């Protein structure tokens, strides 16, 4: 079994949410077998930025990326999270 790299765009509730702290909180909530690989920010509007999180996770997980979205959406300070990309790692 191989892993996939999932790109998740995380929209904060406001511009007062610290994206570095949000990234750390996501890392704490991830189940075993998942890991944060990298982060970026993307301007949205009026000074608000989205967090782009790259998450490595097992390919054959029940619920797929829906479970990952649910975990991130449950974190305080997150308005909405959505998967914007996925790619298979290895062969």
UniProtKB/Swiss-Prot annotation:
GO MF term set: translation elongation factor activity
UniProt keyword list: Elongation factor, Protein biosynthesis
Disulfide bonds: none
InterPro entries: eEF-1beta-like_sf (IPR036219), EF1B_bsu/dsu_GNE (IPR014038), Transl_elong_EF1B/ribsomal_bS6 (IPR014717), Transl_elong_EF1B_B_arc (IPR004542)
Organism superkingdom: Archaea
Family as reported in the entry's similarity comment: Belongs to the EF-1-beta/EF-1-delta family.
HAMAP family: EF1_beta (MF_00043)
PANTHER family the record matches: ELONGATION FACTOR 1-BETA
Described purpose of this protein according to its UniProt entry: Promotes the exchange of GDP for GTP in EF-1-alpha/GDP, thus allowing the regeneration of EF-1-alpha/GTP that could then be used to form the ternary complex EF-1-alpha/GTP/AAtRNA.
Name of the protein in question: Elongation factor 1-beta
Naturally occurring in which organism (per UniProt): Sulfurisphaera tokodaii (strain DSM 16993 / JCM 10545 / NBRC 100140 / 7) (Sulfolobus tokodaii)
């Amino acid at each position: 079994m191989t892993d996939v790299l999932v790109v998740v765009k995380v929209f904060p509730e406001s511009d007062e949410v610290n994206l570095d702290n949000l990234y750390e909180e996501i890392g704490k909530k991830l189940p075993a077998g998942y890991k944060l690989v990298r982060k970026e920010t993307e301007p949205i509007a009026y000074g608000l930025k989205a967090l782009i999180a790259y998450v490595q996770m097992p390919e054959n997980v029940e619920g797929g990326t829906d479970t990952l979205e649910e975990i991130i959406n449950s974190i305080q300070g997150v308005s909405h999270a959505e998967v914007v990309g996925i790619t298979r790692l290895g062969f």
